[in-house]
Curated annotation (Swiss-Prot):
GO terms under cellular component: mitochondrion; nucleolus; nucleoplasm
Taxonomic classification: Eukaryota, Fungi, Dikarya, Ascomycota, Pezizomycotina
Cofactors that this protein relies on: Mg(2+)
Species of the source: Penicillium rubens (strain ATCC 28089 / DSM 1075 / NRRL 1951 / Wisconsin 54-1255)
Binding site for Mg(2+) 2: 179, 181, 233
Protein's GO biological process: base-excision repair; DNA replication, removal of RNA primer
Entry GO MF terms: 5'-3' exonuclease activity; 5'-flap endonuclease activity; DNA binding; magnesium ion binding
Stretches the record annotates as Interaction with PCNA: 341-349
SMART domains: HhH2, XPGI, XPGN
Protein's UniProt name: Flap endonuclease 1
Amino acid sequence: MGIKHLYQVISENAPDAIKTGEIKNHFGRKVAIDASMSIYSFLIAVRSEGQQLMSESGETTSHLMGMFYRTLRMVDNGIKPLYVFDGAPPKLKSGELAKRVARKAEATEAHEEAKETGTAEDIEKFSRRTVRVTREHNAECKKLLELMGIPFINAPTEAEAQCAVLARAGKVYAAASEDMDTLCFESPILLRHLTFSEQRKEPIQEIHLDRALEGLDMDRAQFIDLCILLGCDYLEPIPKVGATTALSLIKEHKSLEKVLEFMKNDPKKKFVVPEDWPYEDARELFTNPDVRPADHPECDFKWEAPNVEGLIEFLVGDKGFNEDRVRNGAARLSKHLKTAQQSRLEGFFKPVARTEDEKASLKRKHDEKLQQQKKKKKEDAKAKKEAKAKPRGAA
């Protein structure tokens, strides 16, 4: 799930933190990718007529199809991917995971019912909700990556946290995940949509943590408190606290402790904090996650030549893939992983920091833009209200 509405909060209040561009803009970069999130997206997206792809023996192959071709797309564009797999989830996450299992069980039941009575759209909708990444999916993807010569490592717990460690140490340029909580783990740069298919034509989002903090006028501790208040994987959300409310509460009170004190003493009793709401534990998981240091032997990785015959045996022999396409993919891997050794020009130059005047100018422009948006919103609401108040048939 990640952090609810965090992208919206950053895009509206710190737009300078987000860059969008094409995948080719990341040529020559090493990127640590949240493997479990990627596999989940492959299981949902790589489909035929609403169903996951299957081998002749009835085994799911959507995860392998996605992993093979989306990784090829990255390598074709000069990116050197490193996949990071989740370890055991933190105990605090067990409540959220239990809810997900329950939701999937409900969706499975609804899916079966939709098959009998529903439309094709209903079947597709409930089918996607039943998707779960299993140990077998992970094991098969690891086998595929090994045969492709693409490195992977196993995180002690959360993959995003381990990706962030590697990015902070400079072993990779960025962490790649759809989960916005990667920023809570202090990844300097987060890439989103990197493993999407080319057909979706979604630009790659590049989010810079330092610019987000600057635009929000927060330190990291306040940012983590904001993310917990917005809603994370570790805690139930507080009812009636949306993006705007969460941001204004942290801005005004500066910390979760002060926010909770305000809620408790509020005479209107607008907010009801769940009885068991261990926000301090959630904060600790973001601040000091269970990760390996970047110089740990298990964080060493390198890219190898693909094992072509091994790929043929696994993908073609065992899983029924097309042999010509697999051989073509292996040839592309061999060619482009060598090409990606070229350095990016930016590696030779130190980026110039913005001056205080430039920062002030950017903030002023952003504030003006926000005021214009608010003004337009008010005008639109007023026009809508007036239109409703007009008698029918009035000119």
